[in-house]
Structure formats: C-alpha cells, structure tokens
Amino acid sequence: MSNAILHSSQYQNYRRIDLIVIHCSATRATQRYTVDDCRRDHRARGFADIGYHYYITRDGVVHAGRPLYQVGAHATGYNAHSIGICYEGGLDIRGRPCDTRTPEQKETLHKLLQRLKEDYQEARVVGYRDLPGVQKDCPCYDV
C-alpha cells in the first residue's frame, strides 16, 4: 500500500462528502491496466486528469489520483460530493462482468475505506451501479 492512504485527510474539510463510490476499470482479468493507463485514457476523453481519487492495482497498491479537495470525474451528478475509488479489473477473461478483485485488492480497499470513514463518517459507500440512473455493472460485485 502506498502513502496515498496516509494523506487522505489532508484536505477533508474543503468539500462535503456524503458518498464514496466504488468503480472497476472494466478491464479483463488477464489485462494489465495501470494507473498511468487510466490517467492517459481519461485525459484522452477530455478530463483534466484521472477521474478517480484512488486507483487500486491488482497487486494491492493504492495509487493517488485526484487530490481529495478536487471534484472527481467518475459519477456524473454525484462528483461534487463524492470520492471515487477504482480497482483494476472487473471483467472475466471473456469480457463479462465479474468480481476479479485479488485478495490484495480486497484487503487494500477495506483498509482504504476504513481510513476514509474516519474522516467522512456520514459518507455512504456504494457501487457505481447502485447510484440512481446508472445502468452499468460496475464495480461488478455487491458493495
């Protein structure tokens, strides 16, 4: 795990956060998709930077994305009051939605959520698919 978790509260009071939204990268279990790949793809779509605040790779390392004081670009209509976390994966080898989180990713996500809930006690943790109006399978498991 990187230092991204240690600095999670650095700017906590700048935005009201009532949601922590879990996403997957929608990449196959056999495909490597790094935080740099995600950042590049988001910039190619016109985003200023990676849309998520945290990105967890298959090895369980959490990478800092946007600073928490910046509004993310991960859940239209919810970005202003949410934190976005994405894990690498979410599709099986055939490209179907599947919980592909590794044990390391599960452990890291659990620790990250514990840390964030210390600062944002009222925030609900939801999967992207659980938000009203979203018609996707992401994050491909029941949050």
Regions found by a protein language model. Give the residues of each.
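A short acidic/small-residue loop/turn micro-motif
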Residues: 70-71
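N-terminal carbohydrate-binding/catalytic regions of secreted carbohydrate-active enzymes
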Residues: 29-37, 41, 66
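Short, well-ordered coil loops that connect the C-terminus of an alpha-helix to the N-terminus
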Residues: 47-48, 122
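Short Gly/Pro-enriched turn/cap motifs at secondary-structure boundaries
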Residues: 44-45, 74-76
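Basic/polar, cationic surfaces and motifs that engage anionic cell-wall
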Residues: 1-21, 25, 58-62, 67, ...
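N-terminal cationic-hydrophobic initiation segments that often serve targeting/anchoring roles
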Residues: 39, 43-46, 117
